[in-house]
């Protein structure tokens, strides 16, 4: 009986997702961040005149540019 309970406990621990990972918007859909990536970002860049491009996704640290948005909750960078 003890072996059965121990086996059940081990299987339960292995099957649980013990780590939390952040989910951020990216250009097309959602991205599950790596465990060390604690922030979502959105930043508009202008690669060509009059053609803005918004970059979105996970990041390790917040961008310092004035046109960047940084946040730390799921799907917050929309």
Swiss-Prot record:
One GO CC term on file: extracellular region
Sites annotated Key residue for inhibition of muscle alpha-1-beta-1-delta-epsilon (CHRNA1-CHRNB1-CHRND-CHRNE) nAChR: 44
Tissue: Expressed by the venom gland.
UniProt-annotated site: Important residue for inhibition of muscle alpha-1-beta-1-delta-epsilon and neuronal alpha-3-beta-2/CHRNA3-CHRNB2 nAChR, residues: 28
Disulfide bonds: 24-40, 33-58, 62-70, 71-76
SUPFAM superfamilies: Snake toxin-like
UniProt site positions, description: Key residue for inhibition of muscle alpha-1-beta-1-delta-epsilon (CHRNA1-CHRNB1-CHRND-CHRNE) and important residue for inhibition of neuronal alpha-3-beta-2/CHRNA3-CHRNB2 nAChR: 48
Sequence similarity: Belongs to the three-finger toxin family. Short-chain subfamily.
Record protein name field: Short neurotoxin OH-26
Organism in which the protein naturally occurs: Ophiophagus hannah
């Amino acid at each position: 009986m003890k072996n059965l309970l121990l086996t059940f406990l081990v299987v339960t621990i292995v099957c649980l997702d013990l780590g939390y990972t952040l989910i951020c918007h990216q250009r097309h859909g959602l991205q599950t961040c790596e465990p060390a990536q604690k922030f979502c970002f959105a930043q508009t860049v202008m690669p060509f005149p009059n053609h803005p491009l918004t970059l979105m996704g996970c990041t390790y640290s917040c961008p310092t540019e004035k046109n960047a948005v940084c946040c730390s909750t799921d799907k917050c960078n929309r």
